[in-house]
Every structure is written in C-alpha cells, then in structure tokens.
C-alpha cells in the first residue's frame, strides 16, 4: 500500500473517531460514525485500519451516554479480534460504570470467545453482590466460551443463519428431527433451564422468522413475544434485540407495549425503541416513537433519537446505517 493510501486510512479513521468522541455532535451522527468504524474493525482478514478502528471505538467509552457506550461494547464484541479484549475487560470490571454497559461488555467477551476471559467472567458470575444483569450475562458468556471450545461443539450441526452477528448463544443444533416452534417455545419460556439453553431456543426461533415471508415467521415471532413477560430483564431485552434484527411487523405490538410501559426497566425499553426504529417503514411506528422524545429516562430518550434517525434511514431505503467521512454525510457502506 502506498503512503498516500495509508494516510487516507489514518484520515478516515481519525475523522470517524472525532465524530464518535465529540460530545457536541448529534447522537445519531455519532452512532453512524460508530457503525462505520465497526465495519472497518470487523473486516476479515484485518487491514491497516483494523486496530485504529478498534482503538477509536474504545475511545468512546469516555462518553457520558450509557446508550452509546453499550453500543461500543457490542461493536467490539463483533470484531473477532483479541485487540478488543483489554478494553472490554476494563469496562466489565468497572463497578462505577452503568450496568447496561458492563452487561454489554460481558456479552461481547462471550462473543469473542477467548478462554483468557473466563477467570474474570466466572468471578463476576459467582459474586452474589453483583447486579443481576451482569451476573446473568457473565453466566451466558462463560457457557458460550466453554461451548465454543468444546468437543461437543465440533460435533454439532447448526442451521445456517441469515444473520452475520455473533450471538450470545448459537441456535439449537440440528438433529434428525428439527425442533418445532412449540418445542422451541417451551424451552424459551422454561425458567428452570440455564439461560444459555433458553437463548439457544431464542435464536433458533429467530432463524425460523427470517426472511419475513417464511411460512414459520409469524408464528415464531409470536412465540418470541411471549418471552417479553419473562422475569429476567436481561432476557426481555434480548428478545427486543432479536425483534430489531428481524424487522417483522408482527413484533410491533409487543415492542410498542414494552416501550410504553413506564414501569419496565430502561435497558428493556431502550432496546424496544431501537427495534421499532428498524421497523420505521411500518405505519404508526414513527408516531409511537415521537411520543417518548421527552421520556423521563435518558437512555430511552437517547434511543428514541437514534431510532427516529434509523426509521428515516429505513424509509429512504439506504443500504447501511453509517457515515462516509469523505462527505461528512450519512451514506451507504457495505455491511460488515
């Protein structure tokens, strides 16, 4: 690569980093910069932009926005790169940090799948004084890493997924008899089972709901919606995240009910808001989101801002929610 190209790479990442870390930039613009950096950080094989992009994402942890910081952690967990580990380990162990951010850092460590994270994750999982959402996430992350490294994993056959995300748990393994939606729903809703196993059912149902015109899609979405009544806030928030991935209109009533419930925890309501943002082309969704622009919870208010920006992006038919540094404007980039 020529010096000019290297300088261009440096300039691209630095421009995005400046937008991401600026507290005076609109939040929606900072999110678009983040997703551009995520694209660069997740490129396989890594390029000369990979490490600077990871460092740029991590620089955002100084932000006051819990919403932004939790999204930073998620993006680092998708990189498949050991360079993300120290930043995530710092966040998950910082008891002064917002629990939503710490949860996302734990989930990201599980997604990266490195055994070197197990000691920290197990200690947090087993700490009775730790907040539930962090303990539960560490429990799932430990199980995911152990599964990733196990001999049993090598023997499992997994159904190919439409989604490129590294999930907190894989879908249920394929067997001679493919699990039915009622079977998966039963596992999903069984609070006596380990969370990791229930998450596997969740992602199995997700994959039966995509694409939206799949014959099983609506029934799978309806099964997932029953999980929004689960006693675990972590579990409820993950269902909302899955709905955001699916963009299935059948999820709108459940998401709207969740966002509208002022007694629901902010972590769940914010995820419902962002999921609705991905359904912005569905009639009535934008009007619903606008009702919560002045919500008492900051994480919900921030999510509404981002969700409305995403809804506009959906209506405009753009390819990827991101920012192109050359123009400084929102534009399309290839999906990571």
Curated annotation (Swiss-Prot):
UniProt-listed InterPro entries: ARM-like, ARM-type_fold, Deoxyhypusine_hydroxylase, HEAT_type_2, PBS_lyase_HEAT
UniProt-recorded name of the protein: Deoxyhypusine hydroxylase
SMART domains: EZ_HEAT
Region (Disordered): 158-179
Pathway(s) per entry: Protein modification; eIF5A hypusination
Localization: Cytoplasm; Nucleus
Gene Ontology molecular-function annotations: deoxyhypusine monooxygenase activity; metal ion binding
Lyase keyword on record: no
HAMAP family in the cross-refs: Deoxyhypusine_hydroxylase (MF_03101)
Cofactor(s) it depends on: Fe(2+)
HEAT-like PBS-type repeats: 68-94, 101-127, 235-261, 268-295
Similarity annotation: Belongs to the deoxyhypusine hydroxylase family.
Binding site for Fe cation 2: 237-238, 270-271
Record's keyword terms, sorted: Cytoplasm, Hypusine biosynthesis, Iron, Metal-binding, Monooxygenase, Nucleus, Oxidoreductase, Repeat
Enzymatic class: oxidoreductase
Binding site for Fe cation 1: 70-71, 103-104
Protein purpose: Catalyzes the hydroxylation of the N(6)-(4-aminobutyl)-L-lysine intermediate to form hypusine, an essential post-translational modification only found in mature eIF-5A factor.
Catalysis performed (reactions): [eIF5A protein]-deoxyhypusine + AH2 + O2 = [eIF5A protein]-hypusine + A + H2O
Lineage: Eukaryota, Fungi, Dikarya, Ascomycota, Pezizomycotina
The organism's place on the tree of life at top rank: Eukaryota
């Amino acid at each position: 690569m020529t010096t000019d190209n290297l300088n261009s790479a440096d300039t691209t990442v630095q421009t995005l980093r400046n937008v991401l870390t600026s507290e005076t930039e609109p939040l929606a613009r900072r999110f678009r910069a983040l997703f551009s950096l995520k694209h660069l950080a997740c490129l396989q094989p890594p390029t000369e932009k990979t490490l600077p992009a990871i460092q740029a994402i991590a620089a955002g942890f100084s932000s006051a926005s819990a919403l932004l910081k939790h999204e930073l952690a998620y993006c680092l967990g998708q990189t498949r790169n050991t360079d993300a580990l120290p930043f995530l380990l710092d966040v998950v162990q910082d008891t002064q940090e917002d629990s939503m951010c710490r949860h996302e850092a734990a989930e990201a460590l599980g997604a990266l799948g490195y055994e070197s994270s197990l000691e920290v994750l197990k200690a947090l999982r087993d700490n009775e004084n730790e907040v539930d959402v962090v303990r539960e996430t560490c429990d799932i992350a430990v199980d995911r890493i152990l599964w990733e490294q196990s001999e049993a994993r090598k023997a499992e056959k997994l159904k190919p997924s439409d989604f490129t995300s590294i999930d907190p748990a894989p879908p249920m393994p394929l067997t001679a008899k493919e699990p039915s939606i009622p079977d998966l729903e039963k596992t999903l809703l069984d609070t006596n089972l380990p969370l990791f196993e229930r998450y596997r059912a969740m992602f199995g149902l997700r994959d039966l709901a995509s694409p939206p015109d799949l014959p099983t899609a609506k029934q799978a979405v309806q099964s997932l919606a029953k999980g929004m009544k689960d006693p675990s806030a972590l579990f409820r928030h993950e269902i909302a995240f899955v709905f955001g991935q699916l963009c299935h209109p059948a999820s709108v009533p459940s998401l709207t009910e969740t966002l509208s419930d002022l007694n629901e925890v902010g972590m769940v309501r914010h995820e419902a808001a962002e999921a609705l943002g991905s359904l912005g082309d569905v009639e009535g969704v934008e009007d619903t989101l606008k009702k919560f622009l002045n919500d008492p919870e900051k994480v919900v208010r921030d999510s509404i801002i981002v969700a409305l920006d995403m809804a506009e992006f959906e209506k405009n038919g753009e390819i990827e929610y991101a920012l192109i540094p050359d123009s400084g404007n929102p534009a399309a980039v290839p999906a990571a």
